[in-house]
Amino acid sequence: DIESITNEAKEVQNYKEALLRGFSLVSDTKLLLKKHIIEIQEILEQNDAGIRKQAGTNLKNAQTGEVIYTPPQDYETIQELLTNLEIYINEPNDIDSLINMAIIHHQFESIHPFYDGNGRTGRIINILYLILKDLLDIPVLYLSRYIITHKADYYRLLQEVRTEDKWEEWILYILEAVEQTSLETIELINSISDLMIKIQDKISQELPKIYSKDLVEILFMHPYTKIDFLVDRLNITRKTASKYLNELENIGI
């Protein structure tokens, strides 16, 4: 229904804002700090509840209701663990950065510091850590799809590290996620680039009077393009912007 679509759209927008804010913080400070993580979660969840202060949080099997894992309950303990994680994230060591990312992700999800949004916050931390280590220039590697597709393995392996110290299988899972997501991302970027060229050619040939590279960029930056976007970027009147959009619609764009 419309309400659920609206809520999903808000979640996506919040995720985008949180990721870009994190990217800005890491780019400016060359650090990924506890206070940055708290700010990212606040943007994701649109509240300032912050780190868990009340006991009672458990991770349960969705089908049976069985408690699978009980994260740290004490506020001071959570703070201390996050401080330790902050040190590990930012201090150099001899471990490969991708393996470090797997370790950091497991530790963060095990601390489970927030009432809500731990999974999404953890996945943003993954991206920001790779940027911090110069493995990414911009935040374009989204592991969420792989993790959600392989959710059962994700939770099983998280727990097996806690109960059986099975780090190797967990690390291999994360490395596979990075590899598969990287290949899919390259394919997606190439597809977008090809489509952009096709749209550019179509507009320049069929609507040469309104064509500009800025116009094409607007269409790809904003899948739902509004009059205001054209007015601001192209410095044209609302009437002209409306005319442009109608002409684009008439040629099937």
Question: How would you label these PLM feature ranges?
Answer:
Residues 1-253:
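FIC/Doc superfamily catalytic core
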